[in-house]
Each structure stands twice: as structure tokens, then as C-alpha cells.
Amino acid sequence: MSKNNENQNNEKRDPLLCHWADQMANQIIREKGDLDSYTCASGITPSGTVHLGNFREIITVDLVVRALRDRGKNVRFIYSWDDYDVFRKVPANMPDPEILEKYLRYPITEVPDTTKRNENYARHHEVDIEQQLPRVGIFPEFLYQASRYRANKYVEGMKKAMQNRDVIKECLNEYRDEAHKMKPEDVYWPVAIFCGKCMKDTTEITDYDGEYGISYKCECGNCETADIRTFKGAKLGWRVDWPMRWNEEKVVFEPGGKDHISPGGSYDTAKLVSKRIYNWDAPVTMRYDFVNLKGVPGKMSSSKGKVIALPDALDVYQAEVLRYLFAGTRPNTEFAISFDMDVLKVYEDYDKTERIVYGVDKAKSDDVFNKEKRIYMLSQIDGKIPETMPYQITFRMLTTLLQIYSGDADKVIASLGDVKPEHEERLRRRIACAWFWIQHSAPDCAPDFCFALRTDGSKAALEGDMLTAVKRVRDEVLPKLDTFQQDKECQQAMYDIATEMGLDAKALFTAMYNALINKDQGPRLGNFMRIIGKDQLQKILSVY
């Protein structure tokens, strides 16, 4: 056997080698060596809602961070808010757009929060995700670039870029075709300026003294020479800022969207700038693909109002299940997060993995077991597999129980009877998700799932033999309900009544659904009646 094949087989056998995050962690260690600390980075401009597409980058880094820590490595996980970027477009999901319009071309930290909740527009979007990440077990160190630039932290990095602007120009040209390359006579400045008077970026650099002095003019009429050691309005453009910060923070891993990691994209040019200007080898990277919503094509854009953010997803998916979606999908694979009937399948898949991990279900092979175990481990909020298997009840069953008990979680848990105290918190989170899905998603995507028991004394329009048959179910089947060991016994008892009376069994079942929930169909009737219970059924059917 070749050494390569042997390594591949070992990776399948070892649970800490079979996941893509583990393979990436090994690559980082192999390429960067044994370090005192490994800095892994992520970041975004808070120009709008931080949606699930953005979250994919965050959790991709988190999974690799966990894999490194599982190898005993000290890891620093930084998340940069690029909040000194320009406010370029008014999003559709913020109030008072006419006010925001006035702040176009300002730094986004200078744009007001028109909801009046936070001190500025950028902070509004930062807070939204910062408060949610702990719910899914993600705890990065947040870096605020506006504060850092205004504190003149990057003075030397800007100076080096200005002094080597011709080299940077060559780096940028390297991946451009002839039609788009900058010409030798073209003026290029790696630094951009926010005007010291009007605060907009409507400026043009007119001179540089070779050290710290940059002269500029603004469309507002302001002209000045600024010393970047004290001036607060200078910042590097994206393609230079990114590699400058790699060196500043000593970043060894940072993924990128497929638009950045494409050949000749911003990562390729940043890699050149990082090495040639800042003498720092670019971090190991990996490409992550877009996240779609089922039925909504294309990349989600936070400049549009129709976005799904992390708290929206956590309304429907308990944290472990949401992590499972990302941990179980390779980052370079485009996938859709669904809020329709597929939600039930996602929960079923997670529960199946959980049963395999605890030996309730048997995996097809050791390789499959190791893979499922690692995905399950990475799906847990704290990264640890619970000592005992969590209480399992299907999402589908919860939707039925919750509607029977009008969303009362305490009554649902009481009806289950065998929930241990240590499992209750996790179960309650699943209950909350199931109830939200029934109230907000199911009416559109699965109306047949929605029902309400007739507890108000109302009656279905039954007559003749069908009315008699329903009464017989009440008088003959309900008294024996607690003796039935299986759902099919309840079904058979009703089928026998229909046969004896010469009725179509399906028509009797339809009549029972009408009597119970005012619908022609619903959950499987025998199981449904056993869940509702004899006393509640007797109360509903007593009006006939």
C-alpha cells in the first residue's frame, strides 16, 4: 500500500482526522509549524444585516479553531468589524431611509442608527450578531477597525504601503488582463482619506512627502496636508488593508467567499502584497460557498431587506441542529437552509446521527461511525458529547403535541412522563423551535400540519349513520383506548365499526377529524387519539 493510501485510510479511522475541519487544522500545523499561538480570522463590513451567508464564514473558522484546540493548540479567534468602510448604499430594512441617504460616503460608524437602538448604524448590526453567537457556542475576540484606525494603530502599515505603492501596483496588475492593468503613468494611492471637514471619502490625494504627510483635496472644497500619525481619517484600501492586518495580527488561517478566493481574486493579490510589502506569508485559506434559502435563488444580500439572520434560523433550528447543518456540509459546497417541510428531515438526520453516536442505531461501518461522531461533536454548543444520550422526540411529534396543548411546553413535557431533569433544557429549546415553526412556517408550507382541537363545544356537521358511527367510536373505542398497546389497534377498532355499519372507513376517519379538529385530515388518527387521551376525547365528543 502506498503511503498516500495509508494516510487516507488512517484519516477515515481516526475520528479527529475524518472531518474537513480536522484536515484543515492539520494543514495549518503542517504549513505554519509548531507555534505558541495560532490566530484564525474572520470579518465583515457591518453595512447591513449579518445574514446566514456571513455566518457560514464565522462558523467555518470556529470549526477549524475547535479542531486546532482538540490538537492541544493555543488558538486566538479574531473577528474584525470593518466598520471604517464607506456607507455606499441604503438598505431596504432600516427605517427613515431619507435620513440615511444623507450619510452616503461617510464612514459607517458616522451613520446614525435610525432605529435609535444603538449609537450608530455599524454598531446596530454588530450588536445583533455579537449577542447571538454565544447561543451557538462561538466566542471570537472582536476587533473594531474604526477604533484602530482612529487610534493610529496602523500608521506604519500605511506608511509602508505608501512608500511601496509601485510594488503594490505591480501586485494588483499581476492578475489583470492587459485591458484592465494600471499603466506606469497612472497614479495609484493605497490609502484613502475621509475628509477632516465633511467626513466623506469624496477626496483625492494630491501629494505625499515620503513619510507621514499626505496632502488631499475634497469635493467640499477642503484642502489640507494631514500627518497620519495624528490624523484620524486615513485608511488603507481593501486589497492592501487585508494583508496589512494579516501581518499585524499574525493570522495563519482565514477562509474567503468564492468571489474572493477565485483565481486572480482579492486573496491572490493580497497574498502578493502580504509577502512583498509586509514580509508575512499569507494565511492558509479555504473557499466557502454561498448559502441560499430554499426557493430563493442566488446569493443573499444584506443590502436587501429579504435576508435571514442567525436569530431567524435559531427560531426554527435548535443551536446543535444549526451547527450540524454547517458541520455536516463541506464549506465549498453551496447549500440551502430550508424553513419548510425540509426542517423535519434535518431534525430526523440530526437525531439519526445522535442515535449512531450512542449506539442505539448501528453505523454501516467504522468509517461512518467516526464521521458521524465527529460531526456530532462539532455540532455541540460546548464541543463535548453529553455523557448520556439526550432525550429524543421527533420534531414531527412535537408539532402534534404542541398543538394539542396549545403551545404549553410544561404540559407537553408532563405528557411525555420520562424526561430527566438534565435533559429538559435541551428539550425545551427544541419545543420552542417546533412551536415557532408551526405558528410561522407551517401555515404556508404545510397547512395540513396545522390544527386546533375543538375545545369550545363546537360541532361538526354530522348526520345519519356517520353521526351514529362517531358516537359509537366515543362509546365503544374510547373506554378501551388505554388498553391498546399499538396505534393500529385503535385504527382497527374504528375500521371494524365502519365495516359493521357498511360505511367507508376513510369517510369515518374524515368524520372523526372533523369532529376533533374541524379538518378533513390530520395526524395519523390512531396515534393522534392516543396522544390526545381518553378524557380530552370524551370532552370533545360529548357534544354529539
Question: Where are each of the predicted segments found?
Answer:
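A glycine-rich helix N-cap at a beta->alpha junction
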Residues: 99-123, 128-132, 136
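Basic, alpha-helical terminal appendages of large translation-related enzymes
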Residues: 1-35, 50, 76-77, 169, ...
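Glycine- and acidic
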Residues: 10, 41-50, 143, 248-259, ...
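Catalytic adenosine-cofactor/nucleotide-binding cores of aminoacyl-tRNA synthetases and other
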Residues: 262, 267, 289-443, 517-544
